[in-house]
């Protein structure tokens, strides 16, 4: 490989966004919602998680001492057994989890996760408190 070509590849590896992990940023970090009201959680990806006509974004609920539970897969599909109060939407880089109406049992931490690119990555979590 010529020196110029090698140098170009090295520089490309250093350009932010040209390679590396997809970063998922959730907001808010925490929220308190009154019983019966709507909770909305956002997840923004540092690059698109869409491929082959699907959005490879998923949502999980985790309660203390328990493993994460899958709620929504491929952005908007409700996992079997999950109440229809939970819904997901979005595409490319912007996604939303909605819980409407909120019930007392929904108090938990919620995570978005992408598996469009390796390594699979998770958002930082949103802690939901029910008032």
UniProtKB/Swiss-Prot annotation:
Residues 81-112 are annotated as: Framework-3. PANTHER family: IMMUNOGLOBULIN LIGHT CHAIN (PTHR23267). The keyword Signal applies. Residues 1-20 form the signal peptide. It holds the Pfam family V-set. Disulfide bonds join 43-112. This is Ig kappa chain V-III region MOPC 63. Residues 44-58 are annotated as: Complementarity-determining-1. GO terms for cellular component: immunoglobulin complex. One of its GO terms (biological process) is immune response. It comes from the Eukaryota. The keyword Iron-sulfur does not apply. Residues 122-131 are annotated as: Framework-4. Keywords: Adaptive immunity, Disulfide bond, Immunity, Immunoglobulin, Signal. It comes from Mus musculus (Mouse). Residues 59-73 are annotated as: Framework-2. InterPro entries: Ig-like_dom (IPR007110), Ig-like_dom_sf (IPR036179), Ig-like_fold (IPR013783), Ig_sub (IPR003599), Ig_V-set (IPR013106), IgV_Light_Chain (IPR050150). Residues 21-43 are annotated as: Framework-1. Residues 74-80 are annotated as: Complementarity-determining-2.
């Amino acid at each position: 490989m010529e020196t110029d070509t090698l140098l170009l590849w090295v520089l490309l590896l250093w350009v932010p966004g040209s390679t590396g992990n997809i970063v998922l940023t959730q907001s808010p970090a925490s929220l308190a919602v009154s019983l019966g009201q709507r909770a909305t959680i956002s997840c923004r990806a540092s690059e698109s998680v869409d491929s082959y006509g699907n959005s490879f974004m998923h949502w999980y609920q985790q309660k203390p001492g328990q493993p994460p539970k899958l709620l929504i897969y491929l952005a908007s599909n409700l996992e079997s057994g999950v109440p229809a109060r939970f819904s997901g939407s979005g595409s490319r880089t912007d996604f939303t989890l909605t819980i409407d109406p909120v019930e007392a049992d929904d108090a938990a931490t919620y995570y978005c996760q992408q598996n469009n690119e390796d390594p699979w990555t998770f958002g930082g979590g949103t802690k939901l408190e029910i008032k």
